[in-house]
């Protein structure tokens, strides 16, 4: 190792570095395949080998973060979608979720440390920060993603940026980012839902309906249960009782045991 440091141009050292990087990339690609086929343990094992071969492999760290983020999502689903847990049961599952979110944050921070020009990882970090309610980090990470002109999915980062501003109560900045995201991608379901929330928070019910109605027009394309809850509330506010009741029914049927379904059933019962 000392010889390699002293003689940077030595052929043997250069060959070894290249071979390790190549081997790391092979391991990374294997991990991608395993992850896509839901073989998570095998994917993590290959990623650890990829990092051992090349500790500078930012992609490997990013994928480790995405795997942890997916696991956190699964814990959240246990708490609020497959059932609506309460008390100690919810606390237990939420603790597991938070642990996985912190793990994801740690890995993805390492990825962007190794490769500052990595917009996909910056956007992933923004998504994790939103779930951890770290609004300032979510803003900074999304902005870093948007700085890269080569990023091919800026609407996702813009939607995360707008959502972070929403939670920071900066409604004008939230509107600006989400409106731009939806304007550039009218079929962007999450963007429409978040934009509608901004309009509602500003008291602009008609604009909120304009944003959310295309989302609920096709539940197979936009299966966002919270979107149907929001649409039901908006139509109820406009006096469209039958429409609101139907939207609450659809909402409750989408995931009947979820916390959102409980809300939808409760609001449906309140309609006169």
Residue spans for each PLM region:
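Canonical tetratricopeptide repeat
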Residues: 29, 63, 124, 160, ...
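Alpha-helical segment of the N-proximal tetratricopeptide repeat
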Residues: 22-53, 90-97
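Residue-level recognition of tetratricopeptide repeat
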Residues: 23, 57, 118, 152-154, ...
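Structural marker of alpha-solenoid helical repeat scaffolds
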Residues: 19, 53, 114, 148-150, ...
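Structural signature of tandem alpha-helical TPR/SEL1-like repeats
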Residues: 38-46, 74-82, 93-110, 132-144, ...
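TPR alpha-solenoid repeat register
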Residues: 60, 121, 157, 191, ...
């Amino acid at each position: 190792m000392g010889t390699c440091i002293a003689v940077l141009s030595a052929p043997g050292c250069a060959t070894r570095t290249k071979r390790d990087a190549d081997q790391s990339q092979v391991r990374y690609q294997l991990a991608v395949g395993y992850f896509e086929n839901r073989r998570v343990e095998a994917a993590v094992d290959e990623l650890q080998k990829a990092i051992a071969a090349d500790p500078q492999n930012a992609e490997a760290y990013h994928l480790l973060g995405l795997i942890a983020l997916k696991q956190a999502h699964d814990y959240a689903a246990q708490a609020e979608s497959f059932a609506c847990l309460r008390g100690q049961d919810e606390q237990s599952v939420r603790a597991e979720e938070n642990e996985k979110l912190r793990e994801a944050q740690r890995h993805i921070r390492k990825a962007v440390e190794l490769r500052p020009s990595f917009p996909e990882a910056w956007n992933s970090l923004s998504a994790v920060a939103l779930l951890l309610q770290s609004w300032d980090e979510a803003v900074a990470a999304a902005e870093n993603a948007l700085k890269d002109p080569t990023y091919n999915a800026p609407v996702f980062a813009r939607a995360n940026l707008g959502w972070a501003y929403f939670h920071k109560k900066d409604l004008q900045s939230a509107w600006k980012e989400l409106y731009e995201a939806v304007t550039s991608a009218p079929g962007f379901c999450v963007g429409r839902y978040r934009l509608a929330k901004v309009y509602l928070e500003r008291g602009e019910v008609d604009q909120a309906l304009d944003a959310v109605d295309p989302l609920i027009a096709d539940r197979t394309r936009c299966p966002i249960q919270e979107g149907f809850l929001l649409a039901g509330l908006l139509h109820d506010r406009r006096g469209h009782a039958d429409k609101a009741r139907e939207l609450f029914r659809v909402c409750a049927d989408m995931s009947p045991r979820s916390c959102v379904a409980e809300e939808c059933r409760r609001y449906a019962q309140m309609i006169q």
